[in-house]
């Protein structure tokens, strides 16, 4: 298996997530996929419009999986500010404002 965007392929190895997750920012690709190299089967996420993409895994048996999470802001740091307003890149809406987003995930055989 590998992680693929329109320009690069990263092999999924047992040690890829040894140091936790990978947070990528401002990717130029519109999609990011996890592809089974022998069959071409894939899970593809449209990441267009998402400034951050987090990829993480819990490779322990019996449930091995990889998660692609497109994000609009960054997670809080372990020792970072506790208030939402003080977090870097945190989005906030004023009273009466609305906001929406769409995430499209495709399963390919």
Feature names for model-found ranges:
Residues 4-48:
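Active-site/ligand-binding surface loops and adjacent short beta/alpha elements
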Residues 9, 14, 52-53, 65-68, ...:
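Generic secondary-structure boundary/loop-capping signal
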Residues 24, 34-35, 56-59, 92-95:
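A general structural signal for short secondary-structure junctions and capping/turn motifs
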Residues 30-32, 66, 101:
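Hydrophobic residues positioned within well-ordered beta-strands of beta-sheet architectures
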Residues 36-79:
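Glycine-rich active-site loops that engage anionic ligands at enzyme catalytic sites
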Residues 83-88:
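Short alpha-helix capping/helix-loop boundary micro-motifs
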Residues 91-108:
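Short Pro-Gly-centered flexible turn/kink motifs
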């Amino acid at each position: 298996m590998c992680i693929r965007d329109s320009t690069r392929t990263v092999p999924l190895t047992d040690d890829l997530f040894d140091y936790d997750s990978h947070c990528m920012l401002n990717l130029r690709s519109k999609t990011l996929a996890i592809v089974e190299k022998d069959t071409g089967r894939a899970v593809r996420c449209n990441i267009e419009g998402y400034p951050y993409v987090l990829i993480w895994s819990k490779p322990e048996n019996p449930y091995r999986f990889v998660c692609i999470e497109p994000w609009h802001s960054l997670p809080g740091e372990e020792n970072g500010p506790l208030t939402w307003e003080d977090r870097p890149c945190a989005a906030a809406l004023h009273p009466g404002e609305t906001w929406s987003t769409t995430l499209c995930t495709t399963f390919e055989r």
